[in-house]
Amino acid sequence: MKACPAREEALALLKKYNSEPFHIQHALTVEGVMRWYANELGYGEDADFWATVGLLHDVDFEKWPEQHCVKAPELLQEIGCSEELIHAVCSHGCGICCDVEPVEEMEKVLFAADELTGLIGAAARMRPSKSVQDMEVSSLKKKYKDKKFAAGCSRDVINTGAERLGWSLEELMEKTILAMRSCEDAVNEAVSAL
């Protein structure tokens, strides 16, 4: 089992440097998505590690967007995060804001799913249900093809993420929708308490 800080400690660090509800919601979503993927892909014993990486992946983004994934190691060291966790967090910015390569499967999942959760979340907000619970891949693909929709979500990063994992775009979308379904209620509850 890989070592990581207690969730309460990780969440406190996130909130120390992030106050915007949107950023906290995104972090909680990616935390839940990463936990789901760990269990789905056979890494259940490391689910807490995967989830912590998801929770902290954007720890530096709100205060230091121009130093995203560069400032993160310093912040993560405040709570004694391992080099492995720091590498994983930084790797999701590969080719975007840093040159840390995603090597482990978990890092590749984070790289792929991070951007896609933003697109899925935006698509969910457009649905009558405002939820991913009734979202299908075919509906998401229509939004994906519309470059003006959620324009800040890079389709190139999502495609590269799927390629790094050796998955089709549809497979990545389907799995990430399922992952977001698994944590949507808990994330909404946590965000409403902010």
Say what each PLM segment does.
Residues 5, 25-29, 67, 84, ...:
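Conserved active-site and cofactor/substrate-binding residues in soluble primary-metabolism enzymes
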Residues 133-194:
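A structured, mid-to-C-terminal "fold-capping" secondary-structure block
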Residues 15, 39, 77, 145, ...:
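Short polybasic/polar patches that bind polyanions
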Residues 43-149, 159:
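Divalent metal-dependent catalytic cores for phosphoryl transfer on phosphate-bearing substrates
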Residues 1-64:
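Acidic/His-rich, divalent-metal-binding segments that scaffold phosphate/diphosphate chemistry
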Residues 11, 28-35, 70-73, 120-123, ...:
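Predominant activation on well-ordered alpha-helical scaffold segments within soluble catalytic domains
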